[in-house]
Amino acid sequence: MLFQEFHSAMSAPAIFTSNQVYAWRPGFDKNNFTRWTKKGLLIKLRNGYYTFPEFLHEPNFAFFVANKIYKPSYISLHSALAFYGLIPETIVQLTSVSTRKTNTFENPFGTFSYKTIKPQVFFGYDPLPFSGEKKLLMAKPEKALLDLLYLYPFYKTKNDFLNLRLDESFIEESFNIELLQSLADGFKSATLANRVKNLLKVIV
């Protein structure tokens, strides 16, 4: 099979699975995945997931990768907070939450870390426009902060919250305190509610 034919068929979804390829062409030679990856024509994202190297230079494509290679998941925690400008740090790993087990993947787009949350708190994210009809599933800033407090219990004191260096202008102009409290109620966790109470003493 000519690679050009394959590329034409698979470039629209941008990220595709081996099963999608077999559905498109039942007689597809699986050795093509290895050959084309070695030649630099394909990028392997994780077992069974691939994309093309031209997407390495597309802004925010790593976020799209994060959504696609481990489902269900949405971008949250430090990566979402940095995306909104709520924290200043340069993020080494792209962090997401998922109802599946905690996992980490590495590929040419970066390191992708997934933390487990319960299905009942898998909410508070938006489908953000990305490219064409593609969307990125990203936590609302308020939910990203709640996920952080929920999954990292060492954030609990005034100094802990000050060390996060939350952007004051974003808090004043864009952060929704009422939404934060409403989303926190959905966790049904007295421990989290107490952390939120301490957080509000710092940011309000």
Region locations from a protein language model:
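Nucleic-acid-binding surface
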Residues: 20, 53-204
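Short beta-edge/loop segments at beta->alpha junctions of small alpha/beta modules
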Residues: 1-72
